[in-house]
Regions:
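Helical "lid/coupling" subdomains associated with nucleotide-phosphate turnover
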Residues: 14, 52-76, 81, 93-97, ...
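Short, Lys/Arg-enriched N-terminal segments with co-localized hydrophobic residues
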Residues: 1-8
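Conserved ATP-binding subdomain of kinase catalytic cores across diverse folds
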Residues: 36-48, 53
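Gly/Thr-rich phosphate-binding beta-strand-loop-beta motif of the actin/hexokinase/Hsp70
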Residues: 10-37, 141-169, 226
Length: 294
């Protein structure tokens, strides 16, 4: 990095590690005044930490072993890329642990990595910051009523913007892993299980609507969450905007299909495929409730 005469170009390499409820991911960025932000690497490992945590508040030792192995792999990658700083964050699965400090200490002993647990608000604030950074139209968009829907494994966060200000943020306990659990229980007993899940979500959303949407006209819904953008709508994501009709058509096409068929068609792992419908159901419900005026 040192050029002639020891001049030092200010380039910094930074890694962001996210331990989510169904995957562990790391992005490595290069930051400099000249080029700004550039992504160098993006690795993901499918690991369903949320599964045990949402049912009994614990991570079993097998899962912890795998997590530490993955983090050690990430460390080697960080060395390869010459990463100077990193931030490793645990999200909802960590928030619901019975003994988070003990787990964090164990991870530190075995990997040398310090994990921060982000509160729900911090997690979503970082999400908004990233939308605001990417979308030049964000400011203009939130002048009109806009709802942001962030679908995670453990929860669904709905935020409302009106006339440029954040009106409210509500967390609803119905993320994709929880919904999938419900689906799997219902699937055995009934044919139209997607309809039942829609009902179970609709109640939560309707009460949200009664409380917050009385006089608000929602014109835009922003869907967030890596899973939606990276997996489900890869090809539509050129301009990052799809109409409600396009979403609903996609939803109707998807909802009746088996996990194996989805995995085949989308060329993704069955583990991920099993989250497709549970991720789309709350989005579809939200769109149908919030965008009634369209």
């Amino acid at each position: 990095m040192n050029g002639k005469g020891g001049t030092h170009m200010a380039v910094m390499t930074f890694a962001a590690i996210d331990i989510g409820s169904y995957e562990v991911s790391m992005k490595i960025f290069e930051m400099s005044k000249r080029i700004g932000f550039r992504e160098l690497n993006d690795v993901r490992y499918s690991l369903e930490i949320g599964k045990g945590v949402y049912s009994d508040g614990k991570i079993d030792s097998e899962m912890l072993n795998v997590l530490c192995e993955v983090l050690n792999d990430f460390k080697r990658l960080m060395q390869d890329f010459g990463v100077e700083e990193y931030r490793a964050c645990g999200t909802s699965a960590f928030r619901e642990l019975v003994n988070p400090l003990l787990i964090i200490e164990q991870i530190y002993q075995r990997t040398g990595m310090k994990i921060e647990i982000l509160s729900s608000a911090e997690q979503h604030f970082l999400g908004y910051k990233s939308i605001a950074a990417i979308e030049k139209g964000f400011k203009k968009m939130i002048q009109k009523g806009t709802a942001i829907l962030d679908v995670g494994g453990g929860s669904l966060q709905v935020s409302l913007f009106d006339k440029d200000a954040l009106v409210t943020t509500q967390g609803l306990k119905m993320g994709s892993l929880r919904i999938r659990q419900r689906l799997q229980e219902l699937e055995k007993t009934t044919i139209h299980y997607d309809k039942l899940v829609e009902e179970f979500i609709r109640n939560d959303l309707m009460s949200f609507q009664r409380l917050y949407l009385k006089d608000k006209d929602i014109k835009n819904v922003i869907l967030m969450g890596d899973f939606i953008t990276d997996m489900i709508f890869q090809e539509e994501m050129e301009d990052k905007i799809i109409t409600r009709e396009e979403f609903m058509k996609r939803y109707e096409d998807t909802v009746g299909k088996s996990v194996d068929l989805l995995a085949q068609e989308m060329e993704i792992d069955p583990e991920y495929a099993s989250l497709v419908v549970p991720t789309m159901v709350p989005c579809a419900e939200t769109l149908s409730i919030f965008l009634t005026s369209e």
